[in-house]
């Protein structure tokens, strides 16, 4: 069976116009070309698609069934050709973006929507991971882009462009004994269990770790749930409280004597210098760079 797009277009036109001659006019073909193409299609399918007893061809039941699927098949064939063309011009087969778990409450989906509108056939994979694991995914090639907080020490293999600033705040459950105090000291923080978002690799020291005793989790959702159950204090994204205002009734921001109890970090789009980025990844990087160059409103 050897069916091509032109045969399907002619079949669709005959079904919609009701005759070979009308289909020919619609497609800019001669009637004999349409008639021959339909005859060859019937041979390839081993089916009779049209009865030719009267002046105009009459679709058979089989033709009507196939016609229902023809439009979608033609759309998929066009999408296939467009995707093949995009791949030939440098579009990656798929793009994996890792989002640091504390940033899941931000507007990272804006960038995904932008990519989808520009590259509708691109396979996009979104994963979440702690900061240290996200960087490792870039360096080992399992992700091509990452949305991460700024790093104190840069790996010489990474490259980045700044996006914006985000804040994290130390919090504790309002039913925890420590919450009854208006101010707390660093010594009190040091002696209270901390719930820290950290790498799954226990050999890596977590960032924003202050307490002597701590429990680890790989995402801020779990950290929040444990903090709510009085299992410790922790540092959570301020954006969480905007998304879920009910948390303001259950959690208290810690006011620490010895340091400002609010951590502001730049958020970066990060990639590996050693990776050969495709057209979609490069497009997003260039988009963010160009946006940064625009004057603030």
From Swiss-Prot:
Family: Belongs to the LysR transcriptional regulatory family.
Protein name: HTH-type transcriptional regulator AceR
Subunit structure of this chain's protein: Homodimer and homotetramer. Binding of chlorhexidine at the inducer-binding domain causes a quaternary structural change that favors interactions between dimers to form tetramers.
Cellular localization per UniProt: Cytoplasm
One Pfam family cited in the UniProt record for this chain: HTH_1
Domain HTH lysR-type: 1-60
Cross-referenced CDD domains: PBP2_LTTR_substrate
Organism encoding this protein: Acinetobacter baumannii (strain ATCC 17978 / DSM 105126 / CIP 53.77 / LMG 1025 / NCDC KC755 / 5377)
Domain notes: Binds DNA via its N-terminal domain and the inducer molecule via the C-terminal domain.
Chain residues forming the annotated DNA-binding region: 20-39
The entry's keywords: Activator, Cytoplasm, DNA-binding, Repressor, Transcription, Transcription regulation
Reported function: Regulates the expression of the AceI transporter. Binds DNA and chlorhexidine. Binds to regulatory sites within the intergenic region between the aceI and aceR genes, and affects the interaction between RNA polymerase (RNAP) and promoter DNA both in the presence and in the absence of chlorhexidine. In the absence of chlorhexidine, prevents transcription of the aceI gene by disrupting interactions between the promoter DNA and RNAP. In the presence of chlorhexidine, activates expression of aceI.
Result of knocking out the encoding gene: Deletion mutant shows a decrease in chlorhexidine resistance.
Main location: cytoplasm
Entry GO CC: cytoplasm
Domain of life from the UniProt record: Bacteria
GO MF term list: DNA-binding transcription factor activity; transcription cis-regulatory region binding
């Amino acid at each position: 069976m050897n069916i091509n797009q032109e045969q399907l277009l002619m079949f669709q036109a005959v079904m919609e116009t009701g005759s070979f001659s009308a289909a020919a006019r619609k497609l800019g073909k001669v009637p004999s070309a349409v008639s021959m193409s339909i005859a060859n299609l019937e041979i390839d399918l081993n089916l009779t698609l049209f009865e030719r007893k009267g002046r105009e061809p009459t679709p058979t039941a089989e033709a009507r069934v196939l016609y229902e699927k023809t439009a979608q098949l033609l759309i998929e064939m066009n999408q296939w050709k467009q995707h093949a063309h995009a791949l030939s011009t440098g579009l990656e087969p798929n793009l994996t973006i890792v989002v640091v778990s504390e940033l899941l409450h931000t507007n990272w989906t804006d960038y995904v929507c932008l990519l989808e509108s520009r590259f509708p056939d691109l396979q996009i994979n979104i994963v979440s991971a702690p900061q240290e694991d996200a960087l490792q995914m870039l360096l080992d090639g399992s992700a091509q882009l990452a949305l991460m907080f700024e790093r104190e020490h840069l790996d010489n293999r990474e490259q980045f462009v700044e996006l914006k600033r985000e804040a994290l705040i130390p919090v504790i459950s309002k039913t925890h004994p420590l919450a009854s105090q208006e101010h707390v000291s660093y010594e009190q923080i040091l002696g209270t269990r901390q719930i820290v978002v950290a790498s799954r690799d226990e050999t890596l020291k977590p960032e924003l770790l202050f307490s002597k005793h701590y429990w680890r989790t790989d995402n801020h959702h779990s950290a929040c749930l444990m903090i709510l159950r009085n299992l410790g204090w922790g540092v959570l994204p301020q954006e969480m409280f905007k998304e879920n205002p009910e948390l303001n009734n259950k959690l208290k921001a810690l006011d620490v004597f010895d340091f400002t109890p609010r951590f502001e970090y730049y958020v970066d789009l990060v990639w590996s210098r050693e990776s050969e980025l495709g057209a979609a990844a490069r497009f997003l990087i260039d988009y963010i760079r160009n946006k940064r160059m625009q004057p603030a409103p």
